[in-house]
Amino acid sequence: MRGTSAVCWSLLLLIALLSQNVTAKGGRGGARGGARGASRGASRVRLKTSSRYGSLRVASQAAAAGAAARAAARLSENTWRNNDHSGMDTQFGNSTNEGMYSYRAWTSGTCPLSSHLSFRLIISIGAILTCSSSSIYVSTKINLGK
């Protein structure tokens, strides 16, 4: 359960950080800018340092990427460990201990990881799409209201 939630949160953070909307206009714009700038003797072009590589943003992206990589590594490690069929039981025995004839193979709870993971992924993707569509609406409204 912890691994599933770690995977979902890492993917959610990673997608949210990588799909951040950077096209929205920042600062004061529109009619307020007319009272400043050329009318006061300053140059028209104002240089503003880019906050694209701010330390907090870079650190949070690195943490999200590290968490996603760690969760993916743990998930792949567990699948490799569970799919190891090189033992003597599976080669020469009838494989009834954990194989096809076991109780868990015929119940609906065979793989609880996939059901929880799919449910959380659907919820996460829905939240991301909702947030991204609202940010697109806000940025369009800002750009149209120049």
From Swiss-Prot:
It is found in: Cell membrane. Keywords: Amyloid, Cell membrane, Glycoprotein, GPI-anchor, Lipoprotein, Membrane, Prion, Signal. It comes from the Eukaryota. It is a lipid-anchor; GPI-anchor. This is Shadow of prion protein. It comes from Xenopus tropicalis (Western clawed frog). Residues 1-24 form the signal peptide. Pfam families: Shadoo. Glycans are attached at residue 94. The keyword ATP-binding does not apply. Belongs to the SPRN family. One of its GO terms (cellular component) is plasma membrane. A lipid is attached at residue 108 (GPI-anchor amidated serine).
